[in-house]
């Protein structure tokens, strides 16, 4: 590692001695972009990150989708200070959780009843549990390559075909768990129908990202989500939308509002916390009323609904509800993404674009990405070269070809212009290698 990252390298040496792999989430590791020490950030301001060596970066990591507001947003900073003065955790109900639940229901009417949790993993795990309780069925169908957190059932890879049960995709996940998970390709109604024809009477729910953000950004084909809902309901299964990434990202009311399709249950996370750890799950009242204390599906959390997160979340949603916010984000993302595509292609690189609102992915492959298998064709070496070239010039991306570029409410057109100029230099350098 060069002198530019000298302090990051020193911190990484210390980190690997006490923190597993030197990082607190594998997504932060540089393993897939050539290895070595990741960059350690010391502070953020607006759309910028500053590392421990004093280097400035235009931030498109966006905290993997959670950082919709940029860094140090003055209204959120004030909300944190104001809330903290009144105490950060009570262990009792509080008025702000009621107000936040009402605000979320206004944005996503399908969420008639809501329960707050701390992480997206908890939200999905809890939604699946109540779906199983409500239907009395054990199995879940999910889509290949879609990440739903790190609970055991979510870490099941596809079997040899849509009628086959999955296999564990992580050490420590048992074959017993895998027996209750079927994985089929995204955007493939035939495979979903085949799986339901075989396992339908045992399937509690079909779990899907309505717009994929976890193998890069991929949109549903026309009619796909309508077909998923129709097939699920025809077999007595529920439809769960995992909107941990897309909720309040692609539209104020998430993908379900943007696309006009309501699920039975929804999970939210990332953005709703305003930068603090907060997630939620909810849906039709008749289903959610199976959750304790009303029903037999148990779920609880010491930090759930704490007053600090509730008040900051309310401030965040107030910011996002203002006129023109999403229109500007969409226009800025289109400007940047389209400019990157033109630049890359002008230097001879074959790229495909997946974009939904203010998140997008550049895939280094020769055909549009519609599912995980086409996403895997994106050239890892080319992504790594782009990632490193941008990083060395002050542009920060998530270190994976399957992650999205994330815009914030604090990026300006000047930031986008600077990014395009730097990216053009990088694409030119890559073409000459």
Swiss-Prot record:
Matching Gene3D superfamilies: Aspartate Aminotransferase, domain 1, Type I PLP-dependent aspartate aminotransferase-like (Major domain)
Enzyme Commission number(s) from the entry: 5.4.3.8
Pathway participation: Porphyrin-containing compound metabolism; protoporphyrin-IX biosynthesis; 5-aminolevulinate from L-glutamyl-tRNA(Glu): step 2/2
Matches recorded under Pfam families: Aminotran_3
Positions of modified residues (N6-(pyridoxal phosphate)lysine): 270
Keywords: Cytoplasm, Isomerase, Porphyrin biosynthesis, Pyridoxal phosphate
Keyword Ribosomal protein: no
Domain of life according to the entry: Bacteria
Subcellular locations according to the entry: Cytoplasm
Family: Belongs to the class-III pyridoxal-phosphate-dependent aminotransferase family. HemL subfamily.
Protein name: Glutamate-1-semialdehyde 2,1-aminomutase
Taxonomic lineage from the root: Bacteria, Bacillati, Bacillota, Clostridia, Eubacteriales
GN (gene name): hemL
């Amino acid at each position: 590692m060069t002198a530019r990252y000298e302090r990051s390298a020193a911190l990484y040496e210390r980190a690997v001695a006490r923190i597993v792999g030197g990082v607190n989430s594998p997504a932060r590791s540089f393993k897939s972009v050539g290895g070595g020490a990741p960059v350690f950030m010391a502070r953020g301001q607006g759309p910028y990150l500053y590392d421990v060596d004093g280097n400035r970066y235009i931030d498109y990591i966006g905290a993997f989708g959670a950082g919709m507001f940029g860094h140090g947003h003055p209204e959120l900073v004030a909300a944190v200070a104001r809330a903290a003065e009144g105490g950060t955790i009570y262990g009792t109900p509080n008025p702000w959780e009621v107000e936040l639940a009402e605000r979320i229901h206004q944005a996503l009417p399908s969420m008639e009843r809501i329960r707050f949790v701390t992480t997206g993993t908890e939200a999905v795990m809890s939604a699946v549990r109540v779906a199983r309780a409500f239907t009395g069925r054990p199995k879940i169908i999910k889509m290949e390559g879609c990440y739903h957190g790190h609970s055991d059932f979510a870490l099941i890879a596809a079997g040899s075909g849509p009628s086959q049960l999955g296999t564990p995709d992580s050490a420590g996940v048992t074959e017993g768990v895998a027996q209750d998970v079927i994985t089929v390709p995204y955007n493939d109604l035939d495979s979903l129908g085949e799986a339901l024809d075989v396992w339908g009477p045992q399937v509690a729910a079909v779990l899907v990202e309505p717009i994929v953000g976890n193998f890069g950004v991929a949109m549903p084909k026309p009619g796909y989500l309508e077909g998923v809902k129709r097939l699920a309901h025809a077999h007595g299964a529920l439809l769960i939308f995992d909107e941990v990434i897309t909720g309040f990202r692609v539209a104020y009311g998430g993908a379900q509002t943007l696309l006009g399709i309501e699920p039975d249950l929804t999970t939210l996370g990332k953005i709703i916390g305003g930068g603090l750890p907060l997630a939620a799950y909810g849906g039709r009242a008749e289903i959610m009323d199976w959750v304790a204390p009303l029903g037999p599906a148990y779920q609880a959390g010491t930090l759930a609904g704490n007053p600090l997160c509730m008040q900051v979340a309310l401030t965040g949603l107030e910011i996002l509800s203002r006129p023109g916010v999403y229109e500007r984000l969409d226009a800025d993302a289109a400007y940047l993404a389209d400019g990157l595509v033109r630049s890359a292609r002008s230097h001879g690189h074959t790229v495909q674009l997946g974009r939904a609102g203010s998140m997008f992915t550049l895939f280094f492959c020769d055909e549009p990405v519609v599912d995980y298998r086409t996403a895997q064709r994106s050239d890892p070496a080319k992504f790594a070269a782009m990632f490193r070239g941008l990083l060395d010039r002050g542009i920060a991306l998530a270190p994976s070809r399957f992650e999205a570029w994330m815009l914030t409410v604090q990026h300006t057109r000047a930031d986008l212009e600077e990014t395009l100029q730097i990216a053009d230099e990088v694409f030119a350098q890559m073409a000459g290698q």
